[in-house]
From Swiss-Prot:
Residues 24-75 form a coiled coil. The keyword ATP-binding applies. InterPro entries: AAA+_ATPase (IPR003593), AAA_ATPase_domain (IPR050168), ATPase_AAA_core (IPR003959), ATPase_AAA_CS (IPR003960), NA-bd_OB-fold (IPR012340), P-loop_NTPase (IPR027417), Prot_ATP_ID_OB_2nd (IPR032501), Prot_ATP_ID_OB_N (IPR041626). Belongs to the AAA ATPase family. This is Proteasome-associated ATPase. PROSITE patterns: AAA (PS00674). GO terms for molecular function: ATP binding; ATP hydrolysis activity. The lineage of its organism: Bacteria, Bacillati, Actinomycetota, Actinomycetes, Micrococcales. Residues 582-583 are annotated as: Docks into pockets in the proteasome alpha-ring. PANTHER family: AAA-FAMILY ATPASE, PROTEASOME-ASSOCIATED ATPASE. GO terms for cellular component: proteasome complex. Residues 1-22 are annotated as: Disordered. Residues 1-19 have a biased composition (Polar residues). The gene is arc.
Length: 583
């Protein structure tokens, strides 16, 4: 038999080479397996190394944080200071030498001491201002600029002393001179402003708005003209002669030795146009001032004083408010702008001294106003206008010539004046009902005239349906008063407003569009019906003074309308004045 080697035909050398190759393949496979194992170990080591690096970085950050915390705990605190003066780099003055006299520095107030300190190179001196707070390091070097102190004592500006100082009045009327901080140097300050001051450094830090003062003085440019006021032609003419003539022709007044009036008193029943006239005066003065100066942008100012709100429980506060009002007026008038100071309900503030029942505040308020009015003498652009429906209660010293020179009584409107007022509210641009227009062939103006005429006739009729009150005088005479005796411009406006509401309701319910004469007549009836309970019979004489029925003393009032309704027709009132009562 043949052997396998013999069968394969291989020589021993070939057989040995084949065996070596087989061994080499096995070794390669073993090495490959080892390489894979080493790669896995390397990947695991790399992952572990990444985790270790992250942990080391976290530990390093924590160590740094703890180190910074320890450093901060051991760091000395910063102190605060207030800048009094900034000293930029400058040339040495004769006799002065050293770094403090030439290098950048700042005078500050720190811990009750005034010091001159240096600035950190990181701090720009141009970004610092006087009165500002700064941070100081342990070496008392300015390292940062802060804001302004937000708390301080309150003081009132009395007078400016140059561009950077002011005279202020603090507690207990204590006066002191303060310097203005950088924040205030850029603002326009006026007398009466409230300032927050730092009493330690002597700086005024900021302007404090005081709503209780601002609400008392309402500055506005009125847009009401004399043409907007109806039924007061004679009174308007009297006021224009008193106010505008001296303003338009000052040379003629000087030639004749006349002075312009300082004030006007408008008195009469409520709702008859006293406030409207005051606003129209301010508007007219502005127009005349613009014509004279050629400055179309010249404004007028109407200081509407809310009289009763001036009263204050603290002694001297009301007088301070009055001084503030006239200081504001002088400020506005200093540039040539006309200023009207309007005191509404003047009797509530300036009543006759000695007539107060429970207080005597008028004994100091009235003299304060008198001194301010006399002080207006040197100003050509300020005029005081007072309005009241109880002029008999105003102190006579205010009403004398030289103070409120012109006294104008605003009467209740008669039929002609009422028609003029109606024409201000019933205008051709309103929608009118087709039936009313058809009665006048579609002529809108004729329709308006007819509506006004019929409405006025209904209001001023003296038949029994318009009887309102029967008054009995002290001498025994009686008089019947009608609704027309209590008419006013405000009532006329209310009648027209009611009629317009009725027209709107008809449009929404029955699709009948437009104002009708029936709406106006119905509004008149409803307006009068609302006045049935209005007469105050607790003191008929006082009520008559306010309503405008002055003359013989009234002792008894009988309400006719209530009598018709089946209620109590009236009652006699005991009108003997009590102690201290002023009638």
């Amino acid at each position: 038999m043949e052997t396998p080697n013999q069968d394969s035909g291989r020589t021993p050398t070939e057989q040995s080479a084949a065996n070596d190759l087989s061994v080499a393949d096995r070794q390669v496979n073993i090495l490959r397996d080892k390489l894979r194992h080493i790669d896995r170990q390397l990947a695991a080591a790399t992952q572990n190394n990444t985790k270790l690096v992250s942990m080391l970085e976290t530990a390093k950050a924590e160590i740094l944080r703890l180190k910074n915390a320890l450093d901060q705990e051991g760091q000395p605190p910063y102190s605060f200071g207030t800048i009094l003066q900034l000293n930029p780099r400058r040339q040495p003055a004769p006799g002065n030498s050293g770094q403090a006299a030439t290098e950048e520095s700042a005078d500050i107030f720190n811990a009750g001491r005034k010091m001159r300190v240096g600035l950190s190179p990181l701090v720009n001196i141009n970004q610092l201002t006087v009165g500002q707070e700064v941070l100081l390091n342990e070496a008392l070097l300015i390292v940062a600029g802060l804001g302004y102190e937000r708390a301080g004592e309150l003081a009132t500006l009395k007078e400016m002393l140059g561009a950077d100082r002011a005279l202020v009045v603090g507690r207990a009327d204590e006066e002191r001179v303060v310097r203005l901080s950088g924040a205030l140097l850029a603002q326009k300050l006026r007398v009466g402003d409230a300032l927050s001051i730092d009493s330690r450094t002597g700086y005024a830090l900021e302007k404090v708005p005081r709503s209780e003062v601002e609400n008392l003085v309402l500055e506005e440019v009125p847009d009401i003209t004399y043409e907007d006021i109806g039924g007061l032609g004679p009174q308007i003419e009297q006021i224009r002669d008193a106010v505008e003539l001296p303003f338009l022709h000052p040379d003629l007044y000087r030639e004749h030795g006349l002075k312009a009036p300082k004030g006007i008193l408008l008195y009469g029943p409520p709702g008859c146009g006293k406030t409207l006239i005051a606003k129209a005066v301010a508007n007219s003065l502005a127009a005349r001032a613009a014509e004279r100066s050629g400055n179309v942008d010249l404004k007028s100012y109407f200081l509407n004083i809310k009289g009763p709100e001036l009263l204050d429980k603290y002694v001297g506060e009301t007088e301070r408010h009055i001084r503030l009002i006239f200081a504001r007026a002088r400020e506005k008038a200093s540039d040539g702008s006309p200023v009207v100071v309007f005191f509404d309900e003047m009797d509530s503030l300036f009543r006759t001294r000695g007539t107060g029942i429970s207080s005597d505040v008028e004994t100091t308020i009235v003299p304060q106003l008198l001194s301010e009015i006399d002080g207006v003498e040197r100003l050509d652009n300020v005029i005081v206008i007072g309005a009241s429906n109880r002029e008999d209660m105003i102190d006579p010293a205010i009403l004398r010539p030289g103070r409120l020179d012109v006294k104008v009584k605003i009467h209740r409107p008669d039929a002609e004046a009422a028609a003029d007022i109606f024409n201000k509210y019933i205008t051709p641009d309103l929608p009118f009902h087709e039936s009313d227009l058809a009665e006048h062939n579609g002529d809108v103006q004729a329709t308006v005239d007819a509506m006004v005429q019929r409405t006025v006739e209904a209001m001023y009729s003296t038949d029994k349906s318009n009887e309102f009150l029967e008054v009995t005088y002290a001498n025994g005479d009686t008089e019947m008063l009608y609704f027309k005796d209590f008419n006013s411009g405000a009532v006329v406006q209310n009648v027209v407003d009611r009629a317009k509401k009725y027209a709107i309701k008809d449009l929404l319910t029955s699709q009948q569009r437009g104002l009708r004469i029936e709406h106006l007549l119905r509004a008149v009836v409803d307006e009068f019906r609302e006045h049935e309970d209005m007469p105050n019979t607790t003191n008929p004489d006082d009520w008559a003074r306010i309503s405008g029925k002055k003359g013989e003393r009234i002792t008894y009032i009988r309400t006719i309308v209530q009598g018709k309704a089946g209620q109590e027709p009236g009652k006699s009132i005991e009108t003997t004045p009590t102690t201290g009562q002023y009638l």
